[in-house]
């Protein structure tokens, strides 16, 4: 376990969640869906840097799921969008940690699963909290 990667990811997740606040009213903003949609690009770049085009092909196939989920979340009502994003971010954290069990992308840095995984998990939990507050407010009128 790379403690430095975990700490850096934790700090970055807090910075992101404080900068990209979700408004309490209105539609879903594009920030969190767009951020989730960019995550596959990192793995694509890792595969390209290692000249591993088999891994690139697999990463593109998997990445299409995250991009589609982001788009669908953006199109839905705020509460449903937040729930979909929560699933997306937490799911991507699991993907980061279990990535090497699925296939090897030789360009991925050793510290990446901890770094990206903690960011994804923290943002997913933050969005779950925001979804619960949003649902509570809408049910109380």
What are these regions (language model features)?
Residues 76-83, 87, 95-112:
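Membrane-helix boundary connector in multi-pass membrane proteins
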Residues 9-15, 65-68, 118-130:
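Hydrophobic cores of alpha-helical transmembrane segments in multi-pass inner/ER membrane proteins
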Residues 1-12, 52-55:
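Hydrophobic transmembrane alpha-helical segments in integral membrane proteins
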Residues 6-25:
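N-terminal signal-anchor/start-transfer transmembrane helix
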Residues 19-24, 45-50, 97-105:
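Juxtamembrane "helix-exit" motif on the non-cytosolic side of transmembrane helices
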Residues 20-32, 51-54, 75-79, 133-140:
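Membrane-interface helix-boundary motifs at transmembrane edges
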Residues 26-38, 58-62, 82-91:
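Cytoplasmic-side transmembrane-helix entry/capping segments in multi-pass membrane proteins
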Residues 47-64, 113:
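A loop-to-helix transmembrane entry motif
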